[in-house]
C-alpha cells in the first residue's frame, strides 16, 4: 500500500508541470504553424500542434488516474489505520491497573486519545504524501519559472507565508481548546449515554429526568459551540485577509508577464505557461504550507495518543505458578491500602489467615472497606503496605495468569453481557468459553439450569435487549448466571462472593448457600453479605469498620462478645419479628 501511494504521489506531483509545459508547446505550435501558412493557400500543417494536444490528453488522463488511485488508497488506508490505532488503545487499556480507571485525569487522556485516534494518523499520512506531491510539483514549477526570473519564485514563496503563519498559530490554539475541555466533552458523552441506554431508561422516565438531562446537554453544547464558533470565525477572517496578499501577488505577476509578452521578451506560449504555472504554483505552495501546518496540528493531537500509549504500567508480577506451602492458604499480614488521590486509608492493618476449605464471611456497613479487601486479594489493587500470601508466597511474586486461574469471583456489580446464556457463563473461564458441557455443569452448580431450560433456545438464547431476539432476565436469574460463571473455573480453589444473592429472596438464598457449601468443601471462600442468615454459615466471620478489623470469630463467639456484630445481627433480627 505504501509503495503504491508513493508511486501515485510521484506521478501526481510531476505531471502538472509537464502539462503546463505541453500547453506552452501547443500555443507556440499553433502560432508557428499559422505564421508558416502561405497567403494564397488554405492548407496549414497542424500535425505538430495536434501531436502536443494528444500528448497533453494522455498526461491529463494519467494525472486523473493517479489522483483517483490516491483517493482509493487513502480510503482503504483510513480503515486499516483506524482499526490499528483503536486496537493499540484497547491493548494498552488491558495492561492498565484498575486504579487508572478510577482516575478522572486518566479518563481525560483516554477521551482525547480516542476522539482523534481514527482520523489524525490517516490525516498525517495523507498530508505527508500530499507534501511530497506538492514538493515535486513545486520543483517542476520552479524550473519553469526561473527561466522567467528568480524573483517570480521569490514572490511565489513570500506571498503564501503570512497565511501559513496564521494557520499554524490557530492550529495550536484549537488544540489547546480541545485539550482543556476534555472533562466537558466527557460530560456531554455521559449524558448521551444516559439518554440512549436501555438500562437507564426506566429510571429516567419514572423520575422525569429527560428534560433536565437535555437541558444539561444543551448547556454543555452551547459552551463548547461558543468556543468553536469564536475560534472558527477568527480563523476564517484572518485566513481571508491574508489570502488577499497571495491574490495581489498573483495579479502583480500577471501584469508583469503580460508586459513581457507585449514587448516581445517572451512568446505567447510562454505567457500561457507562466500564467498557468504561477497560478498553480501559488496554489500548490499554499497547499504545501497547509500540509506542513496540518502535520503540526496532527502531531499536537496525536501527542494525546502518545501520552496515553506511554502511560506507565506497573509490572510487579513474578513468574511463580505454585506455592511453597499449599496447606497454608491465604494470609493478610498488616495490609493497608489508600486509594490514589485520597489521604484517608480504605483499609488499615488487616491481618487474617484462611486455611484451605475454610469459609470467611466479611461483615460491615457500606463503605467500610469490604470490597476493597476483595480487590486486593484478586490483585486488582496492590497493598500500600503489608503483604498478602497465597500458599506461602507473596501475591506480588505470582504469575498473574496462574493466580487468577485459581480464583472464581462474583462482584456485586457483575457484568450482564449482551451475549448468549452459554457465553455469559463461559466468560468465567475464557479458555473454555465455547465448551457447552462445561456450561451445563456450571449452570447446575449455580442453580441456573432450571430456568435456562425454559428459555427459547436454552444456552443459545441471546440475553439483553441490544440485539435482535434478546431476552431479559430478572435480577435473581442474572445472579444465578453470575454464580454459574464463578463455577466455570473448576480448578479454582478460592471463591469470592461479593453480595452474590442480593436480588434473591431469603428462602432461595438459604437454599443456594446450603447447596453452595456442599459444593465448596475443599475451597476457600470469601463471602460478603448483609444477610446474617447466610453469614452465620461461615467458619469465620470478620467485622470491618472504617477500614479496620474490629472483630473476628464464629457466629456464636461474636454474639457472646456483644460487639458490633451482635448489634448488627439483632438489628436485622428485629426486622423479622
Question: Can you name each region flagged by the protein language model?
Answer:
Residues 93, 217, 332-334:
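Conserved catalytic Walker-motif region of ABC-type ATPase nucleotide-binding domains
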Residues 114-124, 177-183, 193-196, 205-252, ...:
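An intracellular "coupling" helix at the cytosolic face of ABC transporter transmembrane type-1 domains
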Residues 95-98, 311-314, 448-452:
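Hydrophobic patch in the ABC ATPase nucleotide-binding domain
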Residues 70, 74-78, 91-141, 196-208:
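Juxtamembrane loop-to-helix connectors within ABC transporter transmembrane domains
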Residues 209, 233, 253, 271-310, ...:
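Cytosolic ends of transmembrane helices, especially the final helix of ABC transmembrane type-1 domains
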Residues 19-23, 27, 59-102, 106, ...:
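Juxtamembrane helix-loop junctions of ABC transporter transmembrane domains
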Residues 318, 323-577:
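ABC-type nucleotide-binding domain
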Residues 3-66, 142-174, 248-255, 259-268, ...:
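Transmembrane helix-loop-helix hairpins at lipid-water interfaces of multipass membrane proteins
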